[in-house]
Amino acid sequence: MDLLSRARKINAMLQTATGKSVNFNEMSASLRDVIRGNVYIVSRRGKLLGFAVNQEIENERMKSMLEERQFPEEYTRGLHDIRETTPNLDIESTHTVFPVENKELFKDGLTTIVPIIGGGERLGTLILGRVNESFSDDDLLLGEYGATVVGMEILHEKTEEIEMEARSKAVVQMAISSLSYSELEAIDHIFEELNGKEGLLVASKIADRVGITRSVIVNALRKLESAGVIESRSLGMKGTYIKVLNDKFLVELEKLRSR
């Protein structure tokens, strides 16, 4: 396969990912087929976002690392020192992706490190591994192109997470602002007693203790439930089961308490 055809496969990977939830394992598999080597996409903190192997590595430590999807902290810190593509590192390198305890078995193992940069910051690292054959200039070009595509997808995912956080926070703030003073007071006492994200409580007991009517509690819970912030379910004489659905709710409630 010539360079142009291989580059087009990476480009197709970007077009396929557009508008969809990112699957870094699929991206790794595409890069593996194009570069013909083992591919690991590692986040800035060492989380293994995706991987695909061309050659299986029979090593318990490596298997455990892939299952846990986490690279060692010391190794990850070392990757941050590499600021540009560094090709064909041998088994003696501290950055080798091959198990050093099996040096004889992987004495011809070569590792290439490609930083993933996006929006002016280090987002992670693309690690390529191959045995017996060094990475050519064409491979490095494709690796850097692949890292750029992966970086775009990581940025896209981060943007979506930020937008989702903002939406969740806005929903909670609107729900809380819809409560009357007495309803807000009731909610404060309810979740103080609940002391967590879910649990069982008896509304009438809280109403008697705080000195508010049961209807105030019911209305307050109904407003939060209609906003999708909580779910509640009556269990008859046992009380009412309440579960927080929006993680931002308890945070915002705590802010109100500290004012």
Swiss-Prot record:
DNA-binding interval(s): 203-222
Highest rank taxon of the organism: Bacteria
Function: DNA-binding global transcriptional regulator which is involved in the adaptive response to starvation and acts by directly or indirectly controlling the expression of numerous genes in response to nutrient availability. During rapid exponential growth, CodY is highly active and represses genes whose products allow adaptation to nutrient depletion.
Record's GO cellular component terms: cytoplasm
Main localization of the protein described in the UniProt heading: cytoplasm
Gene: codY
Matches recorded under PANTHER family: GLOBAL TRANSCRIPTIONAL REGULATOR CODY, GTP-SENSING TRANSCRIPTIONAL PLEIOTROPIC REPRESSOR CODY
Organism: Oceanobacillus iheyensis (strain DSM 14371 / CIP 107618 / JCM 11309 / KCTC 3954 / HTE831)
Keyword Transcription regulation in record: yes
Phosphoserine modifications at: S215
Similarity annotation: Belongs to the CodY family.
Keywords noted in UniProt: Cytoplasm, DNA-binding, Phosphoprotein, Repressor, Transcription, Transcription regulation
Any matching Pfam family: HTH_CodY
Database matches in InterPro entries: CodY, GAF-like_dom_sf, GTP_trans_reg_CodY_C, Transc_reg_CodY_N, WH-like_DNA-bd_sf, WH_DNA-bd_sf
Subcellular localization, as worded in the UniProt entry: Cytoplasm
Region (GAF domain): 1-155
Molecular function in Gene Ontology: DNA binding; DNA-binding transcription factor activity; GTP binding
GO biological process, one term: negative regulation of DNA-templated transcription
Name of the protein described by the UniProt record: Global transcriptional regulator CodY
